[in-house]
């Protein structure tokens, strides 16, 4: 095998432009000099539910090359954006108005309907969680390395 093109085409350091010589060298581990609280804040801002745990893992294993690989695979999670007008309209579309005559005629049936809807919603949610339980995603890499 020959020499990679990137190695061949790079000029020696003494021939590099002045502004390139003054730049800081790139680091393979971007969290090398970071404090634990800085890493936690980074994960919290990205919307991670397990920010403290992930930050602790990264901080303890800062020199491990597997952590760097896991971080490359970790996708940044962004919380959903809220539009000023769309946000209020979105919530209004979920409202359900009960008919006054049905609520007055039989108040117990309205309560039963609401509780049955909550039960169906919780069943759908738990089924979705069970279905996705064993799927490996980008956030599971850090736990696989640690445990």
UniProtKB/Swiss-Prot annotation:
Pfam family, one: TC1
GO terms of biological process kind: positive regulation of MAPK cascade
UniProt-recorded name of the protein: Arginine vasopressin-induced protein 1
Species whose genome carries this gene: Homo sapiens (Human)
Compositionally biased intervals (Basic residues): 121-134
Keywords associated with the record: Cell cycle
Biased composition (Polar residues): 105-119, 137-147
Cited function: May be involved in MAP kinase activation, epithelial sodium channel (ENaC) down-regulation and cell cycling.
InterPro entries noted in UniProt: AVPI1, Avpi1/C8orf4_dom
Region feature Disordered, mapped onto this chain: 1-24, 104-147
